[in-house]
Structure formats: structure tokens, C-alpha cells
A protein has these predicted regions:
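Strongly charged
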Residues: 1-131
Length: 131
């Protein structure tokens, strides 16, 4: 008997990630659209990293308009971490633009959990999800 979560995860739409853009590629992209050089932009990004670390180590969140908020966290072992909360405007722009990447199981976008489980049960009759 398959679990409901296994079936849903098997068929859920997933982005097939391309190569991650690094600082150099970001700097080249931004420099082509501004009067700054790639070196200037990398310097600013390095300074931004230092500034976020500084304020987070002081227990302060950092809000970067258009990107999101970086909030320091701590767990029971005393390990520090940073949570990123995506800016609402950026999320809205992502969802209102046309996505050019590849999506695995794209045909399942908009299907209900019941429809996905029915699909699983039809394709896996020997390992059904039971309600």
C-alpha cells in the first residue's frame, strides 16, 4: 500500500533546475543594464553579504525591498541560521510572468489531490493508495 504523500510527491509538478547563476553571471547581467562594472557590482554584493551578517549577528532582520527579509534564527542546540522570507512583490511578479524553464509533471498543475491519487491508483494497481 502506497502512502498518500508518496503518490502526491511522485506526480507533483517540479521545476527542473538549470545551472545556478553565480555572482559573476549576475554581475555581468546587471552591468549590461547599468553604468556599473561587473567588479563594482561584485563589490556591492560582497558588502551586502557583510551587512546582512552584521545585522543578523545583532539579532536584527534585514529587509531588502524587492528581494525579501533575512531573519536570524536559533535552534535548541544554539546553532544560528537565517530564514529568508521572499518579498511579496517578487513572488507576485514570478507568478504573473511567463516561466521559461522546464517543469516536470506540468500536466498535473491544477489537479486536486483526489485526481492525483486516482492517477496513481490507475498506474499502480498492485500498490494503491487507500483512503
Amino acid at each position: 500500500m502506497a502512502s498518500r504523500i508518496s503518490a502526491l510527491n511522485h506526480y507533483r509538478p517540479q521545476i527542473e533546475y538549470g545551472e545556478t547563476a553565480d555572482w559573476r553571471e549576475m554581475a555581468d547581467y546587471m552591468a549590461a543594464r547599468s553604468t556599473l562594472s561587473p567588479s563594482d557590482i561584485i563589490g556591492v554584493l560582497t558588502g551586502l553579504e557583510d551587512a546582512v551578517l552584521h545585522f543578523n549577528l545583532s539579532g536584527r532582520g534585514v529587509k531588502l525591498e524587492g528581494l525579501g527579509t533575512y531573519l536570524p534564527n536559533i535552534n535548541y542546540r544554539g546553532e544560528l541560521d537565517v530564514a529568508h522570507r521572499l518579498d511579496r512583490r517578487l513572488k507576485r511578479q514570478l507568478n504573473n510572468s511567463s516561466f521559461n524553464g522546464r517543469i516536470r509533471n506540468k500536466k498535473n498543475i491544477g489537479k486536486s489531490a483526489a485526481e492525483v491519487i486516482a492517477l496513481w491508483n490507475a498506474e499502480h494497481p498492485d500498490d494503491p493508495v487507500l483512503y
